[in-house]
Design a protein with these regions (language model features):
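Alpha-helical transmembrane segments and their membrane-interface boundaries
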Residues: 1-64, 107-116, 132-138, 142-143
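Ligand-binding beta-strand-loop-alpha-helix segment within the catalytic cores
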Residues: 48-49, 65-75
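Hydrophobic transmembrane alpha-helices of multi-pass small-molecule transporters
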Residues: 74, 99-100, 125-126
Length: 143
């Protein structure tokens, strides 16, 4: 039951980032970001359980973090498209990678770090949009 708190926190934080992407009609939105964040948390929590249950010198819990980063990299790569000289989806790929990191932070019970990272991610995703528009007027290819 103690795992319910990190799972709920992860769901909320992933949803916040996913909502921003959904409102911008980006390739990966609410469900994708929420599930990636939640899945990352679950993998870390499962590793914690495995170490407690089967612990030993050969069981390295940091390997799961490596696996999450690698797996999410493939998912993010699927959101990147190149079309007519423009590359689309890089920001969405980065946000997928970011929610995996947020979910991992929640999984290791670093809730403050996860919340601060979510706030900063939202500031970058939403706040930098006006900076990009100011720097490149008439160019809607950002994000």
């Amino acid at each position: 039951m103690k795992d319910l708190v990190p799972m709920l926190i992860s769901t909320v934080l992933g949803t916040l980032v996913g909502w921003e992407r959904q409102m911008g009609r980006k390739p990966a939105g609410l469900r994708t970001h929420t599930l990636v964040c939640l899945g990352s948390t679950l993998f870390v929590l499962l590793t914690e359980h495995a170490v407690r249950e089967f612990g030993g010198p050969s069981l390295d819990p940091t390997r799961i973090i490596h696996g999450v980063v690698t797996g999410v990299g493939f998912l993010g790569a699927g959101s990147i498209l190149r079309q007519e000289g423009y590359v689309h989806g890089l920001t969405t790929a980065a946000s997928i990678w970011m929610v995996a990191a947020i979910g991992t932070a929640v999984g290791v019970h670093s809730y403050g770090l996860a919340i601060i990272s979510t706030v900063l991610a939202l500031l970058v995703l939403e706040g930098y949009r006006w900076v990009e528009r100011w720097l490149t007027p008439g160019d809607d290819s950002n994000g």
